[in-house]
Amino acid sequence: MALSFLGAAPTNLTRPKIDADGAWNFFGGDFKTFFISGDKEHFTSRQIFKAGSPHTGAGRGSTATPPYHYHLYQTETFAVQSGTLAYCIDGKEGTLAAGESVVIPPYRHHTFWNEVSSGTDLDVHITVRGGDNPGFDEAFVHAFCKHLSTRAESCLLILDLCSKT
């Protein structure tokens, strides 16, 4: 699956820490993802975005906010477990609270993030279904998050080096 918005691949991806409960940690633990379920028909992951983090709690500008995108084949469902999920779907913004969900069919542009004003961590289950080429599974989520986390760490290293010159 080619994702042009990712740019050139970094040469050394940051290896995530994996907790005893199976959570993969990115951005120093500010973002966690868990495998919930999956088969030929669907994939569901649990994702936790830490409030107050520049990577996961800075609103739409957070490092871990997915770019505005759409899926050719998949229907994506966001089911909020706790916290507040903010979203933009086809240019319209809104929020979801715990117990609420939204279903996004193919070809609908969207992104989502942890709503800053809630001041709480966002815990969301994300399910992707459908298409002849699902292409969205646990391996994709891990690779995408490793890529974002590595790029963020590289930027911080460059900024640190520049401040010392």
Name every feature range the model reports, one short phrase each.
Residues M1-T75, A79-T165:
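Jelly-roll (double-stranded beta-helix
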